[in-house]
Design a protein with these regions (language model features):
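Membrane-embedded beta-strand positions in outer-membrane beta-barrel channels/transporters
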Residues: 39, 68-72, 126-128, 183-185, ...
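Repeated loop/turn-to-beta-strand initiation elements of outer-membrane beta-barrel proteins
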Residues: 38, 78-83, 137-141, 190, ...
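Outer-membrane beta-barrel "beta-signal"
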Residues: 37-39, 190, 217-229
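Short glycine/proline- and aromatic-enriched beta-strand/turn motifs that initiate or cap beta-hairpins
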Residues: 27-74, 81, 149
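Extracellular/periplasm-exposed beta-strand and loop segments of Gram-negative cell-envelope proteins
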Residues: 46-64, 86-124, 150-179, 204-218
Length: 229
């Protein structure tokens, strides 16, 4: 089993243990358990994957817009399992000729001619828990945490040539990495009818390890529409 997959499985096991303990604590106090719900939303993502290239003459565009879909299954009035998918996104950095430095830890890079490096993150999948304390009004707060599973390609394009970690690349993918990292989030929701709400939240990853020097470092603000079945 690849090291990255082994680490991912260990994280998943740890998360499931935490979820089990939380469920055991709250399920005993459950009264009327809400119906399952689904959420559709959009996020403004900030991805710091290319921030290590910052320097003179370098232009970095580290924002993109994604969409997401999640399903929540309640095990108590306040606690639910959450699973979903986030659409892919990409960010880019334009580098001048003769730029050089270290990136992804101790890996060296240099450019011959101007070029653009783009990271393309495929659809990411998440699994976690969401906690929303009971309230008497329409406005409520919630927190969530879990694991995000991701897959990212680093691509060089343009007339220049990139030398990365001792190898030379031109107009091609030079690095592919996949893994998983914890995420945490806080949000506000407003109930507009018995089974429908709007929500606004902030989510960020909490990278615990780097795979081939790459650590997922995302954050984003989201607006969404929630509907209970």
């Amino acid at each position: 089993m690849p090291i990255s997959r082994l680490k991912m499985n260990r994280k998943l096991i740890s998360t499931l243990v935490v979820i089990f303990v939380m469920v055991a604590s709250y399920a005993s106090t459950a009264h009327e358990i809400p119906k399952p719900s689904f959420t559709i939303g959009v996020s403004l993502i900030n991805d710091k994957a290319l921030d290590g290239l910052a320097g003179t003459g370098v232009t970095i565009d580290d924002n993109d817009i994604t969409a997401y879909f999640t399903v929540d299954y309640y095990v108590s009035p306040s606690l639910s399992f959450e699973g979903g998918v986030i659409t892919g996104h990409e960010v880019s950095a334009s580098l001048p000729s003769n730029a050089s430095g270290t990136w992804h830890g101790t890996k060296s890079y240099s450019t011959s001619g101007a070029l653009t490096i783009t990271t393309k993150t495929d659809n990411s999948y998440l699994f976690g828990v969401k906690y929303e304390p009971s309230t008497t009004g329409s406005l409520s707060v919630y927190g969530k945490a879990g694991l995000m599973f991701w897959d990212v390609d680093f691509i060089v394009s343009g007339s220049g040539t990139l030398t990365y970690n001792g190898s030379t690349y031109n107009s091609k993918t030079f690095l592919q990495v996949d893994g998983s990292d914890p995420y945490i989030g806080l949000g506000l929701s407003y109930e507009i009818s018995k089974n429908t709400s709007f929500a606004f939240d902030y989510v960020t990853t909490a990278s615990t390890n780097a795979i081939e020097g790459v650590a997922l470092d995302l954050s984003g603000y989201s607006i969404s529409w929630l509907r209970k079945f």
